[in-house]
């Protein structure tokens, strides 16, 4: 989760988030090199006395500034397309969870189990226990097994919402009448927080998401107790 005064991204918990962080560093390095080159050329123009007022064309320069940006775009596009494919591809999910956005709460249905569904509301500030996080705790957490591919089917009952958990690299729009999907795979157990990331009305800020990732054995015990 995020901390006060934190700089940078949240710690990666899923393979997709690890890839996104690597891509962020890769792209940031390219941007840094381009910015350094541009600043160097600007400083050179301001300090040098060499001018070329009679130059009408420069084929070599035009070729370079056409080919070089194309190469840079390819270097950015290829890893980006690879990650997009990874985020969209779901191979043999062991579990499917249907997520519905409402004003202003989430409802979850474990489609592989009978009668395993619940609503998830934010816990009001005056009902929080010591150590719980303001505006982030819910009455019913989403319990999921770790190290297994899980498919989330995401939609909405009313207006646009967005189901987002930054540590897992997840952000999927919840659109009325449309079913979007996302892959959840956690590398380690823990509790991970997210929020609705699409302005959906006056209580948009009060739609937290809490995932509790646990080993498969404990998940089976929990699901048995819930059904």
UniProtKB/Swiss-Prot annotation:
Binds a dinuclear copper A center per subunit. It comes from Desmodillus auricularis. Component of the cytochrome c oxidase, the last enzyme in the mitochondrial electron transport chain which drives oxidative phosphorylation. The respiratory chain contains 3 multisubunit complexes succinate dehydrogenase (complex II, CII), ubiquinol-cytochrome c oxidoreductase (cytochrome b-c1 complex, complex III, CIII) and cytochrome c oxidase (complex IV, CIV), that cooperate to transfer electrons derived from NADH and succinate to molecular oxygen, creating an electrochemical gradient over the inner membrane that drives transmembrane transport and the ATP synthase. It catalyses: 4 Fe(II)-[cytochrome c] + O2 + 8 H(+)(in) = 4 Fe(III)-[cytochrome c] + 2 H2O + 4 H(+)(out). Residues 1-14, 88-227 are mitochondrial intermembrane. One of its GO terms (cellular component) is mitochondrial inner membrane. Residues 46-59 are mitochondrial matrix. Keywords: Copper, Electron transport, Magnesium, Membrane, Metal-binding, Mitochondrion, Mitochondrion inner membrane, Respiratory chain, Translocase, Transmembrane, Transmembrane helix, Transport. The chain crosses the membrane at residues 15-45, 60-87. NCBIfam families: CoxB. It is a multi-pass membrane protein. Its cofactor is Cu cation. Belongs to the cytochrome c oxidase subunit 2 family. This is Cytochrome c oxidase subunit 2. The gene is MT-CO2.
């Amino acid at each position: 989760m995020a901390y006060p005064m934190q700089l940078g991204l949240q710690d990666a918990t899923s393979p997709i988030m690890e890839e996104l962080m690597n891509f962020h560093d890769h792209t940031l390095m390219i941007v840094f090199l381009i910015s350094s080159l541009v600043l160097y050329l600007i400083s050179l123009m301001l300090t040098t006395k060499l001018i070329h007022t009679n130059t009408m064309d420069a084929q070599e320069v035009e070729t370079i500034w056409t080919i070089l940006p194309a190469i840079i775009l390819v270097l950015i596009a290829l890893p980006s397309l690879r990650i997009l494919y990874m985020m969209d591809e779901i191979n043999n999910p062991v579990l499917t969870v249907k997520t519905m956005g409402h004003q202003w709460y989430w409802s979850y249905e474990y489609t592989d189990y009978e009668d395993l569904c619940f609503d998830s509301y934010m816990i009001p500030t005056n009902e929080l226990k010591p150590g719980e996080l303001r505006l982030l705790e819910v009455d019913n957490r989403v319990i999921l097994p770790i190290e297994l591919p899980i498919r989330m089917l995401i939609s909405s009952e009313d207006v646009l919402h967005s189901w987002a958990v930054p540590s897992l690299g997840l952000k999927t729009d919840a659109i009325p009448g449309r079913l979007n999907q996302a892959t959840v795979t956690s590398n380690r157990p823990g509790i991970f927080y997210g929020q609705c990331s699409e302005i959906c009305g006056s209580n948009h800020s009060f739609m937290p998401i809490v995932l509790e990732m646990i080993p498969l054995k404990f998940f089976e015990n929990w699901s048995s107790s819930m059904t």
